[in-house]
UniProtKB/Swiss-Prot annotation:
Belongs to the mitochondrial carrier (TC 2.A.29) family. The lineage of its organism: Eukaryota, Fungi, Dikarya, Ascomycota, Saccharomycotina. GO terms for cellular component: mitochondrial inner membrane; mitochondrion. The chain crosses the membrane at residues 13-33, 77-97, 129-149, 183-203, 230-250, 266-286. One of its GO terms (molecular function) is folic acid transmembrane transporter activity. It comes from Saccharomyces cerevisiae (strain ATCC 204508 / S288c). This is Mitochondrial FAD carrier protein FLX1.
């Protein structure tokens, strides 16, 4: 029996899709916590809203609705799982193709390719940054409708008035109340937020190639250990998330139910948040996001690197 040989693009898509799915299953409750903290930034009544207040609210909603706390914590799992699997699969596929295209457009004639590693060993941070940005822009545009529905589902308890009961119900209600353009709410800050992924990949792949280069020079297996993956992932994510977090917060608020009720627009929304909490309001929920983002990205990239290595 002949082993199936996956193409580089297939490896990227399969590894990315699998990594996104596994990560979502593990950290979904933290994602829900992050969304609700971000949405509290536009509420004067919730100016001092923190993680424990969100948890108390979830427990209270659970008691009122008769649903278990676990069900409340995993509200919106289906669409989050679907969205992250699609987004990571598309992103990794596009990123792998795009960085090769950019490299080949600037490479000198006669540049060599090492067996099994593509041209990554010849690339620099600018190529990773450019590939990450262009791939992120395309992925953000393709998946924005999913994130609008996800944000609205996760921002409310199932028993709340007007809450979406499912993905299908969410699409129906959104099209009825907001029209087709409602599917693209929050796209502008989402496109600016693409810089987070681009910065992350610039840091991650640059550090990764340095480690692999040393392994290659010492005749070792050209593959990151899980500990090495966690090390460079944590550093890259901490830097990138902190720098562009306000765009994530703005996107979540523009995609929420409250955005439709109060007719939020980007610049008035920024003014409202600053009026409620000052400039620090643009970073509301950052600590919870880092607690979620760093472990989740470590899981994503450990699954991605290991699966890609074995395909």
């Amino acid at each position: 029996m002949v082993d199936h040989q996956w193409t580089p693009l297939q490896k990227e898509v399969i590894s990315g899709l699998s990594a996104g799915s596994v990560t979502t299953l593990v950290v979904h409750p933290l994602d829900l916590l992050k969304v609700r903290l971000q949405l509290s930034a536009t509420s004067a009544q919730k100016a001092h809203y923190g993680p424990f207040m969100v948890i108390k609210e979830i427990i209270r909603s659970s008691a009122n609705s008769g649903r278990s706390v676990t069900n409340e914590l995993y509200r919106g799992l289906s669409i989050n799982l679907f969205g992250n699997a699609i987004a990571w699969g598309v992103y990794f596929g596009l990123y792998g193709v795009t960085k090769e295209l950019i490299y080949k457009s600037v490479a000198k004639p006669g540049e060599t390719q090492l067996k099994g590693v593509g041209n990554d060993h010849k690339m620099n941070s600018l190529i990773y940054l450019s590939a990450g940005a262009s791939s992120g822009l395309m992925t953000a545009i393709l998946t924005n409708p999913i994130w609008v529905i996800k944000t609205r589902i996760m921002s409310t308890s199932k028993g709340a008035q007007g809450a979406y009961t499912s993905m299908y119900n969410g699409v129906q209600q959104l099209l009825r109340t907001d029209g087709f353009q409602g599917l693209w709410k929050g796209l502008v800050p989402a496109l600016f937020g693409v810089s987070q992924g681009a910065l992350y990949f610039a840091v991650y792949d640059t550090l990764k190639q340095r480690k692999l280069r040393r392994k290659r020079e010492n005749g070792l297996d050209i593959h990151l250990t899980n500990l090495e993956t966690i090390e460079i992932t944590s550093l890259g994510k901490m830097v990138s998330v902190t720098l562009v977090y306000p765009f994530q917060l703005l996107k979540s608020n523009l995609q929420s139910f409250r955005a439709n009720e109060q007719k939020f627009r980007l610049f008035p929304l920024i003014k409202l948040i600053i009026a409620n909490d000052g400039f620090v309001g643009l970073y509301k929920g950052l600590s919870a996001n880092l607690v979620r983002a760093i472990p989740s990205t470590c899981i994503t990239f450990c699954v991605y690197e290991n699966l890609k290595h074995r395909l």
